[in-house]
UniProtKB/Swiss-Prot annotation:
Residues 9-41 form the LisH domain. This is Nuclear distribution protein nudF. GO terms for biological process: cell division; establishment of mitotic spindle orientation; microtubule sliding. SUPFAM superfamilies: Lissencephaly-1 protein (Lis-1, PAF-AH alpha) N-terminal domain (SSF109925), WD40 repeat-like (SSF50978). Dimerization mediated by the LisH domain may be required to activate dynein. Its main location: cytoplasm. GO terms for cellular component: cytoplasm; microtubule; microtubule associated complex; spindle pole. Residues 60-86 form a coiled coil. SMART domains: WD40. WD repeats lie at residues 113-154, 156-196, 200-240, 243-282, 285-345, 347-386, 391-430, 432-446. It comes from Aspergillus terreus (strain NIH 2624 / FGSC A1156).
């Protein structure tokens, strides 16, 4: 023992053993051990109390460390198997070719300032600004390249539930929604002044998205079972879509703003035509609430068409061919927009919270309450090709892709969150994603 422990460590261990025997009323054993170890009479009752429980704490601590070691060894084995499965030529190509980029295992930046869970994030379409909304009722603006907090926006009376940048070219606005029943518009060119507050929903507003970057139209989804379309230049609601859903949780527009897909608490997903405010398809198949939904970009059509059994991919100009949805049933489903289920992706261990397509169209990224980011390869029938475990310390609530680089300004003016409105075949894009979590942190992965 003396060769492993120092004298002071050995003394502490001996006294902890005597204290443990005393605490379980094994007086005879305790006294015998004291004599054997030469612990004198100065080890009185007060000193004994000091060492009570220490042995159990060390024992349980060792057990926790052993479990952690086993988890880490399992993760190392999994990562090594993943690495071994990729030929060296392919690995080097992945670093050179943005089309095959997957996020690193660890984040490039971690932003910490919020005092409650992160619910939503959004990238500025031109500048290196990233907005984050939280249950702490604030919005924070970060420089995601420098990793610095720029400002904090206050105005909502309840938690912020959704964010999006958009508006006409040259006049980008930030829209936010909240459990306080309002939508607020913030002007980055005026130090993010709150220039307008939109009223009309009768319950919590779950999500906001700009329809396109060339119009002043904004869509919102709410717990009041309605979807509203707003003219941000006037603040008026120009169209209301109602349904039997008890609570819309998410809404997403097609890249041309002609279609909407929305999901909610009734387990159903509905595709709506914006011009007529009429439903065009119902996507039925999830076994629990639908947390997120998104139209697939045209770049993914060739892969999704193959999954759907089609010999030919739809035209890139078509804006509403395929949809991805994520649910509390722990699955991701890929659909034809007309309502046919083509694939269910299984792998997450908890609610799916957010989805984003790789701009190349080859991959779909997902985040979940299981604290992972998962990357699904659509060119391999949706095979799970990468998992970033413990990407956050708590539930991951949202994910967004950075917009195109500044030198692609013409394209950037025609994008929303990295997806081109003009659907070019080879759009320029940045290999950057951001995630937000219930751990109150925002992380940027490169």
């Amino acid at each position: 023992m003396s060769q492993i422990l120092t004298a002071s460590q050995a003394e502490e261990l001996h006294k902890s053993m005597v204290a443990y025997l005393s605490s379980i009323k094994a007086s005879q054993s305790s006294n015998t051990l004291r004599e054997e170890l030469g612990i004198g009479d100065n080890f009185d009752e007060a000193t004994c109390k000091k060492y009570e429980g220490l042995l159990e704490k060390k024992w349980t601590g060792i057990a926790r460390l052993q479990r952690k070691i086993l988890d880490l060894e399992s993760k190392i084995t999994s990562l090594q198997a993943e690495l071994d499965s990729v030929p060296s030529m392919a690995r080097s190509k992945q670093h050179q070719d943005p089309d095959n980029w997957l996020p690193a295992q660890s984040s490039a930046h971690t932003f910490e300032s919020h005092r409650d869970a992160i619910t939503s994030i959004a990238f500025h379409p031109v500048f290196t600004s990233l907005a984050s909304g939280s249950e702490d009722c604030t919005i924070k603006i970060w420089d995601w390249e420098l990793g610095e907090l720029e400002r904090t926006l206050k105005g909502h009376m309840r938690g912020v539930s959704g964010l999006d940048f958009g508006g006409q070219k040259g006049h980008t606005l930030l829209a936010s929604c909240s459990g306080d029943l309002t939508i607020k518009l913030w002007d980055p060119s005026k130090d993010y002044a709150n220039i307008r507050t939109l009223h009309g929903h009768d319950h919590s507003v779950s999500a906001v998205r700009f329809l396109t970057s060339t119009e002043n139209l904004l869509v919102s989804a709410s717990r009041d079972a309605s979807i509203r379309i707003w003219d941000v230049s006037t603040g008026y609601c120009v169209r209301t879509i109602t349904s039997n859903s008890i609570w819309f949780l998410d809404v997403s527009p097609s890249f041309d703003g002609k279609w909407l897909v929305a999901g909610g608490r009734d387990q159903a997903v509905t595709v709506w035509e914006v011009s007529s405010a009429e439903p065009r398809a119902a996507l039925l198949g999830h076994d629990n609430d639908v947390q997120c939904c998104v139209f697939a970009p045209p770049a993914s059509y060739e892969y999704l068409a193959t999954l759907a059994g089609h010999k030919k991919a739809p035209l890139a100009s078509s804006s509403s061919e395929f949809i991805a949805t994520g649910s509390r049933d722990k699955t991701i489903k890929l659909w034809e927009a007309r309502g046919r289920l083509i694939k269910t992706l299984v792998g997450h261990d908890n609610w799916i919270r957010g989805l984003v397509f790789h701009p190349s169209g080859k991959y779909l990224f997902s985040v979940s309450d299981d604290k992972t980011i998962r990357c699904w390869d659509l060119s391999q029938e949706g095979r799970l090709v990468k998992t970033i475990s413990n990407a956050h310390g708590h539930f991951i609530s949202c994910i967004r892709w950075a917009p195109p680089p500044r030198n692609a300004a013409a394209e950037a003016s025609e994008t929303t969150n990295g997806v081109s409105k003009k659907a070019p075949t080879k759009p320029a894009f940045q290999c950057v994603i951001a995630t937000g979590s219930a751990d109150s942190c925002v992380r940027v992965f490169k």
